[in-house]
């Protein structure tokens, strides 16, 4: 087995509850969280150590998006601080970004999130809402543009559709935080997807 210390978590209801359950499984102050859709590069170093001289934070690595070619922290491996994770009770739109975090510009692998129509749409919808909500930068504008273009590969049309639907929804609710936060729940996203498909 490639990663003998890896622990699998499944069957937990709720996004925040899943993060908390993963944190509680950790025997150390930091733990890596890896989505099952990430194809981890053999060269990725799981022995990365947090900077103990800094305040506690989460470390976000880069992952490649096979649909639009972007490489950044979206759906990447993340080294979570166990205690910050547990203390995140009412996160914002993004659980990880709700606490101090640092980006580590090292590629961990490729995130093959585009495996079903619903997940392809949902992942794009959520990510584009986050990009719409953040203060615009040259980088965030570029990412938003790439998400909204037709990419390549399986369900590329639904990835684009999810992105465009998110831009439309953001405008429709005028960036209202409560309306945006509805997308945190999988049941709401499922209903939204079913209403457009």
Where would I find each of the regions flagged by the language model?
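Short, solvent-exposed coil/turn elements at secondary-structure transition points
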Residues: 12, 37, 64-66
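Short, surface-exposed beta-edge/turn micro-motifs
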Residues: 28-29, 75
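Catalytic-site signature of metal-activated, phosphate-bearing donor transferases
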Residues: 47-197
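Residue-level signal for functionally critical sites in structured catalytic/ligand-binding pockets
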Residues: 18-19, 35, 72-74
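N-terminal anchoring/stem segment of glycosyltransferases
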Residues: 1-27
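Short beta-strand-to-loop acidic/aromatic patch adjacent to the donor-nucleotide binding site
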Residues: 22, 29-42
